Amino acid sequence: MIGRMLGNRYEILEKIGEGGMAKVYKAKCHLLNRIVAIKILRPEFAADENFVKKFKRESQAAASLSHPNIVGIYDVGQEGDIYYIVMEYVKGRTLKELIRENGGPLEVKRAVEIASQVCRALDHAHKNKIIHRDIKPQNILVTDEDVVKVTDFGIARAANGATITYTGDVIGTAYYFSPEQAKGSIVDERTDIYSLGIVLFEMLTGKVPFEGDSPISVALKHIQEDILPPSRLNEKVPEELDKIVLKATQKDPNLRYQTASEFLKDLDTFLKNPKDLKFEEKDFEKTKVMPSREAEELKRAALKREREKKRKEIRKKVGIVLLVLLLLASLSYGTVYVLNNFFKVNDVVVPNVVGLSLSQASKVLSEHNLKMEISEERYSDKPENTILEQDPPQGALVKPGTTVYVVISKGRQMVIVPNVIGRDYLEAKNVLENAGLKVNIIENYNEQYQKGYVFDQNPRYGVQVEYGTTIDVYVSKGPKPSIVPNVVNMNLDEAKASLESAGLTLGKVIYKEADNVPENTVLEQSVPPDTEVQKGSPIDLIVSKLPQNSLQQQTKNVIINLPNKDGPMKVEVYVIQDGQKNLVYSGEHTSSDSPLTVPVTAHKGKAVIEVDIDGQVYSRVEARF
């Protein structure tokens, strides 16, 4: 796998880890020139069509999550029989490694801070209707800067959904199971709260609350046994923190924190002032031991394969007996008739339930002595819980009690629009498409964002929209350029004003003798009219002056002592004569150019010479020409 290129984009560099369902590699994205992590499904899962469908759907949903405490999912892809997720590459280690390296409990404050960051991640995910189902230290990364990032949202959800629907087994780590997970029941967001409570217990004590010889024995303890307060194992744990852990790990989900934000609020309060925490007695009712019937169900699940094996042996023996009976029955037509009527069971015609609601379909099938089981939930434009498909189909002949498997609608898939403002447009497009959204790129000028970066989006981020909605993404073309105006034949003052109104500056002014043209008239400009240039660009001008042999004009050299300033300064020289003020020189200089000599031409007689520096009057002197 090392050196392989996936999707003509991701080059596999090295293996950095592996788990029960996938292997993780460090890779380079050649499109965006960045390092990423790629999780590749193990072949045994990639070969399971139902698992792959669930995996794709849930990974794409998880890709819509955008939060600093969640490992970002950039891409979900397939190449042949390889299914992979492209994720944010996190420099750091897992929380499990951190606990092992510490050789015992973490410092109390640090443990609570880590749990708080995980809570923030769960709160964001739960608000987006995504449950993790496999919160454990191995799925919590801690960066070198102590930023916590939760990973494996997509793969955990896909595994859980697939196994509940298709096998009845429970995938996950038994040490962190909630009681409802251990029983294989339907779970909600509170299962993550329980698991995080177990993780917090481990951070505070250096060990998990329950251990056993097998996953089943550990799962039974989660169902039946009380969790000790962490302070029993670590005297540094305050009583208030004991109560937080015990509330999060109540057997009854209704007695736990009901949301991650509730859990987070108590953790933050503990960090600020533990005495402000308020708990009610009902929060800590004695753990109710689950009925032995439910415990037995869990035990029986472990013996399921053994029973299946025995059933096969019984079926084999029954088959032999039936074969003997049929051979005997063939002795006469009358015997066959008797046996047929004795063993005959009337077949049932499967009714149509497609288009019905779940409750309606259940009633119809029950009336026909048939059972119903949900095989898949799928997003569609049909109302929630509407039957989309059935198997066996309408009209099929089946035995009474046969199970009809149905696919039901989850309604229209809704997604939260992620924030892509400030991202490179290729990255923004990838994030939105991974969230199941379409992208419409609109390019426009923008003064604040550099070319190629997103400066706006519509709908805005955080809005809930239907899966497949098109998002308008506004990409910057950079600052809007200025159009160079035509200033030829204008006098110099008019030309300067025209350039400034267009967002441009007057550059160098070069004087050229010209006959039959008024003095200070623009003869040429350095950039042609209607040309697009960057805002603030200087435009040089060639301006007319009277010929040297003119008896009406005289030229004198004006010596200017420039001020001592850092950087360049703009020097402009004006001649004020006969009630008119004319610009006769403009240029940029530094203090090192001092003294500056400027030739000034004026009509015979008195004139005032004004020197402006950076737009401010610097000096005025009267001269005679």
Curated annotation (Swiss-Prot):
CDD domains: PASTA_pknB (cd06577), STKc_PknB_like (cd14014). Residues 10-271 form the Protein kinase domain. The active site is at D134. Residues 344-410, 411-477, 478-545 form the PASTA domain. Belongs to the protein kinase superfamily. Ser/Thr protein kinase family. Keywords: ATP-binding, Kinase, Nucleotide-binding, Repeat, Serine/threonine-protein kinase, Transferase. Coiled coil: none annotated. It catalyses: L-seryl-[protein] + ATP = O-phospho-L-seryl-[protein] + ADP + H(+); L-threonyl-[protein] + ATP = O-phospho-L-threonyl-[protein] + ADP + H(+). This is Probable serine/threonine-protein kinase Sps1. ATP binds at I16, G17, E18, G19, G20, M21, A22, K23, V24, K39. The keyword Repressor does not apply. It comes from Caldanaerobacter subterraneus subsp. tengcongensis (strain DSM 15242 / JCM 11007 / NBRC 100824 / MB4) (Thermoanaerobacter tengcongensis). GO terms for molecular function: ATP binding; protein serine kinase activity; protein serine/threonine kinase activity. Disulfide bonds: none annotated. The lineage of its organism: Bacteria, Bacillati, Bacillota, Clostridia, Thermoanaerobacterales. Its EC number is 2.7.11.1. The keyword Signal does not apply.
